[in-house]
């Protein structure tokens, strides 16, 4: 199995955590598109948003997706990667896409527990629980339309990893 595996989902869904664990289990390299952009540009997400706006960030995000995609790699994408139909189509055509699904309350609790971990500028300026609920409601159908498989990411990371490995084994 030398496919590309993409992880999509909202902030705090576990894309990086599960993606790294899955890459280790498969002996694949792992890349997080947000970290890739930081390492290749020396700009944080917030820096790009301030200087280029969200449109500039989304453009860079799409470029990063295409640059890092190759056979036999696990890619954790930014939460908004699915906003572009081109990105959704690209991922579906070039690999297996897992949507890490979790209720807004779970995601908000994770963000509140680790306020500095991977934080991006607020999308709405509202309290985190409200923002997560609003963003998730707006993107849920996009995540599902991009995904080949939906994983319950509200459970422990080890359980999510087992779900992913079982699904990959079935499709091999």
From Swiss-Prot:
Documented EC number(s): 2.7.1.71
Entry keyword annotation includes Kinase: yes
Compartments (UniProt record): Cytoplasm
GO cellular component, one term: cytosol
InterPro entries in UniProt: P-loop_NTPase (IPR027417), Shikimate/glucono_kinase (IPR031322), Shikimate_kinase/TSH1 (IPR000623), Shikimate_kinase_CS (IPR023000)
Keyword Chloroplast (UniProt): no
Gene3D superfamilies on file: P-loop containing nucleotide triphosphate hydrolases
Catalytic activity: shikimate + ATP = 3-phosphoshikimate + ADP + H(+)
Major localization class: cytoplasm
Pathway annotation from the record: Metabolic intermediate biosynthesis; chorismate biosynthesis; chorismate from D-erythrose 4-phosphate and phosphoenolpyruvate: step 5/7
A GO biological-process term: aromatic amino acid family biosynthetic process
CDD domains: SK
Residues holding ATP: 9-16
Keywords: Amino-acid biosynthesis, Aromatic amino acid biosynthesis, ATP-binding, Cytoplasm, Kinase, Nucleotide-binding, Transferase
Pfam families for this protein: SKI (PF01202)
GO MF annotation, one: shikimate kinase activity
Enzyme class (EC, first level): transferase
HAMAP family assigned: Shikimate_kinase (MF_00109)
Family: Belongs to the shikimate kinase family.
Protein name: Shikimate kinase 2
Organism: Syntrophotalea carbinolica (strain DSM 2380 / NBRC 103641 / GraBd1)
């Amino acid at each position: 199995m030398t496919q590309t595996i993409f992880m999509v989902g909202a902030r705090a869904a576990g894309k990086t955590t599960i993606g790294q664990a899955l890459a280790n289990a498969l002996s694949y390299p792992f890349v997080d598109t947000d970290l890739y952009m930081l390492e290749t540009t020396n700009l944080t997400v917030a820096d790009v948003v301030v200087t280029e706006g969200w449109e500039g960030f989304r453009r860079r995000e799409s470029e990063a997706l295409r640059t890092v995609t190759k056979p036999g790699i696990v890619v954790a994408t930014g939460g908004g990667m699915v906003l572009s139909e081109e990105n959704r189509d690209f991922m579906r055509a070039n690999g297996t896409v897992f949507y890490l699904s979790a209720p807004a309350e779970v995601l908000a609790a994770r963000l509140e527990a680790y306020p500095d971990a991977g934080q991006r500028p607020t999308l709405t300026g509202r309290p985190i629980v409200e923002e997560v609920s609003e963003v998730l409601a707006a993107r849920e159908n996009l995540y599902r339309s991009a995904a080949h498989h939906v994983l319950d990411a509200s459970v422990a990371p080890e359980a999510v990893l087992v779900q992913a490995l079982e699904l990959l084994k079935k499709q091999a």
